[in-house]
From Swiss-Prot:
Predominant localisation class: membrane
InterPro entries, sorted: ConA-like_dom_sf (IPR013320), LDL_receptor-like_sf (IPR036055), LDLR_class-A_CS (IPR023415), LDrepeatLR_classA_rpt (IPR002172), MAM_dom (IPR000998), MAM_domain-containing (IPR051560)
GO CC, any one term: membrane
Span of domain LDL-receptor class A: 26-53, 228-266, 456-491
Alphabetized SUPFAM superfamilies for the sequence: Concanavalin A-like lectins/glucanases, LDL receptor-like module
Region of interest (Disordered), residue spans: 280-307, 429-455
Protein's organism: Homo sapiens (Human)
Glycosylation sites: 203, 281, 339, 583, 636, 835
Name of protein: Apical endosomal glycoprotein
Residue span, MAM domain: 64-222, 269-425, 491-644, 654-809, 811-969, 971-1138
Ranges of the Extracellular topological domain: 23-1151
Length: 1216
């Protein structure tokens, strides 16, 4: 009998998850020396599992990587104190400000390894060690991302232990940057076993947390043996094939050193500096180093290249800045038609000003006297020895000069100089034939003429005419020289000049950027004469992308754009991108979307306003040995309108519907998270036309790692003393962050408006008044800031407009950013305050908006010394615009424990009339007030506090909201206009998730019911929550009612909708009662449900004031599935009618045979699997449960607490 379709996946999950089963696919029993050696000997690569990486990572796609999403990949904490490493996500296990999101997923559901805060009085070190690894190739590179929460970690080190020696591959220096930072270190050739260790050290004064994520081992495996090699390749003794240029290059490419044996390389002249300089001559400036770098010399190499050991020797330049150290070779005889090749290893780190140059100095009669520059490397190449090679053909005797010049805080190093067998010293051939007549070679020149300082200007200054332009004014997009020389090598170029516009290659791998002619290129279709920048082969040993950079640039203006022509012909792994390098951070500004098939295309990139210094970098990767003549090129690079003083007509266009472009608005560049100009993405439609453009911030974008994103206007001159900025915003998603509006003026920033959390799947209008000093012409900027404190949802903006004059009163006011134009009156004084310090003289400890002490509200002191008994203090709004239909104004109010008096509410239209009077109950709870409003003219609302003459009393207001439609009854809502009095505040302890509001007619990226229950059509609305965002074992989202009075018996009636794809996916909906007595679960439904609306009724009883809570959570495997609510009705003082039969208790027609057959099969499985299978069957299935309380509530003796230990705040209490 076939297995029932819904039992098979459950059985698989059971077998995989049972503690007695350890199922690992297809072990091929590789020998111990073949395990964790970066080579997949098993077909499924199981011999490389739990090696500090896995054989394949579906998230990263790197060959050997660990993202910590499933497990620690074999990494083990070996700390000897309580300061230790652990696997964590969202800072849940750390006592301190750990990362709120990982690097892999960029959300709070992703995992990483972290070490928490240190409480001890002495320094402690937390160590995380890899399993034993074996045989790293010379090209091996470890790439990872690290995060320091508060920038105060004393030290982070990456160490490699091999035999009795422990090498420090990298050690943190200087201040920590914000967010996740990338780190890449090379291991060098490691023979035999080794381990990698991450060590974090702190002392008693340092706090914060450090985390690691996305470890990747690149190009670490040795080549595999081959029966036959491609033509021209060398067949090693161990049957490995290596390319001919890898012979005698100072590296063990074969893995058995047979490519470096004396038989092959005996005639090469190799200098490793272990015993001296060999045949090379030293001038002042080079020092042979016997000790690796340490804390006193953080930029120096920590190991040599020859031995890959801290005990090895190498050369470093110790010359004074501005004075190069020169190393000269022996004199060589003319090479004739054969190439004299020099392989050398260079180390440039710690400074962008470091430089290593290789010159050819010809000798003898008739030879040119000036040295010829053959190779130059400048800038930061990282903490690695980088291979290079130069081939020399000379008709004259010659010398090779190596000139090293250090920059501030940097180092230039040399190791392993290897001259090929065609480099024949003069002393070697002099015994065979006499030297030609003529003068002897002169001493090497200290500097070639091309590198001498110009005129009398200081080092780094540019001489033009009578000017000495300082370095900070070079490439600042403002011409200082009459001929513009200071802006000529600043990125703009057609590559016809050899200077290439200042672009300089900084590649360290097997690819490089090189200026070539069109005839040289085989990858592009260009046929005309000319030059461009092209990806070409290089001599580096590392498998890294090619990089080429501009000099230091900036500052730039908001209109700055880069225009370029490019081609890309590549397989899927290849790419071409433009990166902005700013103060150590790297921002992806542009990427070729697809291969151009070798056809030249043009594009432009908005760079925007940036501080100095920044650099532009083209990054490329292609497989030049792959099929289809792969390649990439860049030409006609132009930087336009980059001066900060450049203005255009568009700069004054603050009002914008984003249909044509973004007008005067441009994205900030402080992080990798950006606002993007899009069409019908995120929100399914724009606000202007329903089919047009808007600007979008999506925190789920793969590259959105930054904490916030800025959208700025260009500087504006006030058109009037008061202006009104209006805009439409869309803030939607189960865990979306905060949207803010601010104004910058003269270095100060003023917050004008903000919203947090989902506002429903619709566009909302908002406005803010811009106040300027009369007669002032000081420019200002407007700033929309999207905070990435949530990871599921979208933010969008559309239809921004500015007009003279003040704005209407806002429809919503939380008092978080301002007093919303309210003005005090009467005897007392209302004021806006927060209780963050805990020392406020009066007022509630927390606000209602955020339910934290940092939140703001309006409060008035009603104590006798501030407001005598019977006296009033009024708070009057600005004018509201006329209403086209009846509306409901809701607000939350709070009274002191001792009687605060009375709160009256008035409406001012043609006259003033009272619409509401509330006796402000004492207690710790915020309470909801509501009033129906009809106004055909402009109107105001007035809140008036009447003092009761009681000391230490107050009245507070928060969260005023004006919505269309009549006010609902307490605890009831049909969700047609919104959530009514139900609060969906995201609780951080539950993961920060929120219920949302939407309807079937509005497309959403989240699943939802096609129709509501109220109208039964897609035009209706409901509250819903998508449980799939919670993840495995996830937390919950709450929808809470307003505080309701104690009741002996009342009825809660509602309709709910649940839909999940399979039976073993399980969403849960619960009804909780929350009061000062605790939390009680009174109803719940879980498991698979038909996609239809179902009715539920719950008897409610509580001896204390309480709130009703709808809790949505996920009880099983993650799955896309919504839980929705509609037509919630709270019938105070009424018993529920007899509930309809639960659909969970009704068998579906035709299901009996399947059940019987499944039962028989399960019976056989029980015999085989024993008690473990029976336990699983007992847990299988889920039915609605309901707990009916009696009229005399017996107390919360069966209090329900969440498994994650969330402590819920006492938001309601009883009256005193």
């Amino acid at each position: 009998m076939p297995l029932s379709s819904h039992l098979l996946p459950a059985l698989v999950l059971f077998l995989a998850g049972s503690s007695g089963w350890a199922w690992v696919p297809n072990h091929c029993r590789s020998p111990g020396q073949a395990v964790c050696n970066f080579v997949c000997d098993c077909r499924d690569c199981s011999d490389e599992a739990q090696c500090g990486y896995h054989g394949a990572s579906p998230t990263l796609g790197a060959p050997f990587a660990c993202d910590f999403e499933q497990d620690p990949c074999g990494w083990r904490d070996i700390s000897t104190s309580g300061y230790s490493w652990l696997r964590d996500r969202a800072g849940a296990a750390l006592e301190g400000p750990g990362p709120h999101s990982d690097h892999t997923l960029g959300t709070d559901l992703g995992w990483y390894m972290a070490v928490g805060t240190h409480r001890g009085k002495e320094a402690s070190t937390a160590a995380l060690r890899s399993p034993t690894l074996r045989e790293a190739a010379s090209s091996c590179k470890l790439r990872l991302w690290y995060h320091a929460a508060s920038g105060d970690v004393a030290e982070l080190r990456v160490e490699l232990t091999h035999g009795a020696e422990t090498l420090t591959l990298w050690q943190s220096t200087g201040p920590w940057g914000p967010g996740w930072q990338e780190l890449a270190v090379t291991t060098g050739r490691i023979r035999g076993d080794f381990r990698v260790t991450f060590s974090a050290t702190r002392n008693a004064t340092h706090r914060g947390a450090v985390a690691l994520d996305d470890l990747e081992f690149w190009d670490c495996g040795l080549p595999t043996p081959q029966a036959n090699c491609p033509p021209g390749h060398h067949h090693c003794q161990n049957k490995v094939c290596v390319e001919p240029q890898q012979l005698c290059d100072g590296e063990d490419n074969c893995g058995d050193l047979s490519d470096e044996n004396p038989l092959t390389c005996g005639r090469h002249i190799a200098t490793d500096f272990e015993t001296g300089l060999g045949p090379w001559n030293r001038s002042e400036g080079w020092s042979r180093n016997h000790r690796a770098g340490g804390p006193e010399r953080p930029s120096w190499p920590r190991r040599d290249h020859s031995r890959n050991s801290a005990q090895g020797s190498f050369l470093v330049s110790v010359a004074e800045p501005g004075t190069p150290a020169i190393l000269s070779s022996p004199e060589f005889q003319a090479s004739g038609t054969s190439n004299c090749s020099l392989v050398f290893y260079q180390y440039l780190s710690g400074s962008e000003a470091g430089c290593l140059q290789l010159f050819l100095q010809t000798l003898g009669p008739g030879a040119p006297r000036a040295p010829v520059l053959l190779r130059r490397r400048r800038g930061e190449l990282g903490t690695a020895w980088v291979r290079d090679r130069v081939d020399i053909q000379s008709a004259y005797p010659f010398q090779i000069l190596l000139a090293g010049q250090t920059g501030p805080g940097g180092v230039v190093g040399l190791d392993d100089l290897i001259l090929s067998d065609h480099c024949r010293p003069v002393s070697e051939v002099s015994t065979l034939q006499p030297l030609p007549p003529g003068p002897r070679a002169p001493a090497p020149q200290p500097l070639p003429p091309s590198s001498r300082l110009q005129d009398s200007c200081k080092q780094g200054h540019l001489a033009c005419g009578d000017l000495c332009v300082p370095p900070e004014q070079l490439c600042d997009f403002e011409e200082q020289c009459a001929g513009g020389e200071d802006e000529q090598a600043c990125g703009t170029t057609d590559f016809e000049s050899p200077e290439a516009g200042g672009w300089e290659d900084a590649s360290v791998g097997r690819l490089q950027w090189r200026r070539v002619s069109a005839q040289e290129s085989q990858g592009s279709s260009a046929a005309a004469a000319g030059h461009f920048l092209s990806l070409q082969r290089a001599w580096g040993q590392l498998g890294a992308e090619a990089r080429v950079l501009t000099p230091l640039l900036g500052p730039s203006g908001p209109s700055c754009e880069l225009h370029l022509a490019y081609y890309l012909q590549s397989q899927p792994r290849g790419f071409l991108a433009l990166v902005v390098v700013d103060n150590g951070s790297r921002e992806l500004a542009w990427q070729a979307l697809s291969s151009s098939a070798g056809i030249w295309k043009v594009d432009k990139v908005l760079l925007g306003a940036r501080r100095r210094p920044f650099r532009l970098e083209f990054v490329g990767l292609v497989d030049l040995d792959g099929p289809d003549q792969q390649g990439a090129g860049v030409d006609n690079v132009t930087l336009r309108d980059c001066s900060p003083t450049v203005t255009t007509e568009r700069d004054r266009e603050v009002s914008c519907n984003f249909e044509r472009d973004t007008c005067s608005w441009y994205p900030g560049h402080l992080s990798d998270t950006h606002w993007r100009w899009v069409e019908s993405r995120g929100p399914d439609h724009d606000h202007t036309t329903g089919q047009g453009h808007f600007v979008l911030l999506d925190p789920t974008d793969p590259l959105a790692w930054g904490h916030s994103a800025h959208l700025l206007s260009r500087p504006q001159v006030p058109a009037a003393p008061t202006e009104c900025l209006s805009f439409w915003y869309h803030l939607h998603g189960p865990q979306i962050g905060t949207l803010r509006l601010a104004m910058r003026r003269e270095g100060e920033e003023t917050h004008l408006w903000s919203r947090s959390g989902t506002q429903g799947n619709r566009w909302h209008e908002a406005w803010a008044t811009l106040s300027h000093q009369p007669g002032s012409h000081a420019q200002y900027q407007l700033l929309f800031e999207g905070l990435r404190d949530g990871y599921h949802g979208t933010m969008a903006l559309d239809d921004v407009a500015v007009r003279p004059g003040p704005c209407w009163a806002p429809n919503y006011c939380s008092f978080e950013d301002s007093d919303c134009g309210f003005s005090p009156g009467g005897q007392g004084l209302w004021r806006r305050q927060a209780n963050a310090s805990g020392h406020a003289a009066w007022g509630p400890p927390t606000d209602h908006t955020t339910e934290t002490a940092q939140g703001h509200y309006m409060v008035v002191d009603t104590s006798p010394d501030a407001l005598p008994r019977g006296q009033t203090a009024s708070l009057t709004s600005k004018e509201h615009r006329p209403l086209a239909q009846p509306a409901c104004l809701t607000f939350w109010y709070h009274g002191s424990l001792r009687s605060p008096g009375t709160l009256r509410v008035y409406l001012e239209e043609r006259g003033r009339h009272q619409v509401l009077s509330l006796s402000a109950h004492g207690g710790l709870a915020w309470r909801l007030g509501s009033m129906d409003v009809q106004a055909e003219r402009a109107w105001r609302v007035v809140f008036e506090a009447v003092a009761a003459g009681v000391a230490h009393s107050y009245v507070a207001l928060d969260d005023l909201l004006l919505q269309d439609g009549p006010c609902p009854q307490p605890g009831s809502c049909d969700f047609e206009s919104g959530l009514c009095g139900w609060s969906h505040l995201a609780w951080p302890g539950l993961g920060g998730y929120s219920w949302d509001w939407g309807g079937g007619a509005t497309p959403s990226r989240y699943p939802q019911p096609p129709v509501d229950h109220t109208l039964g059509t897609e035009a209706g609305h409901f509250a819903f929550f998508e449980t799939g965002v919670l993840g495995p074992g996830g937390r919950a989202a709450w929808l809470r009612s307003e505080p309701l009075p104690a009741t002996p018996a009342s009825c809660l009636r509602f309709w709910y909708h649940m839909g999940f794809p399979e039976h073993f996916y399980k969403g849960e909906l619960k009804v909780l009662l929350h009061s000062a007595q605790g939390q009680l679960a009174v109803w719940g439904a879980g498991g698979h449900r038909r996609h239809q609306w179902l009715e539920a009724q719950v008897e409610v009883a509580s001896a204390k004031e309480f709130q009703i809570v709808f809790e949505a959570t996920l009880g099983g495997q993650p799955a896309l599935g919504p839980i929705a609510l509609d037509d919630v009705e709270y019938l105070a003082g009424q018993h529920c009618q007899q509930p309809a039969p639960s659909p969970g208790n009704t068998a579906a027609p035709g299901s009996v045979p399947a059940v019987v057959g499944s039962a028989l099969l399960l019976l056989m499985l029980l015999v085989l699997l024993g008690l473990g299978g029976r336990r699983w069957l007992q847990k299988k299935g889920s039915c609605p449960f309901q707990s009916n309380t009696e009229a005399t509530a017996p107390g919360f003796d069966n209090i329900l607490f969440n498994a994650d230990g969330v402590t819920l705040p006492a938001s309601v209490t009883s009256d005193p």
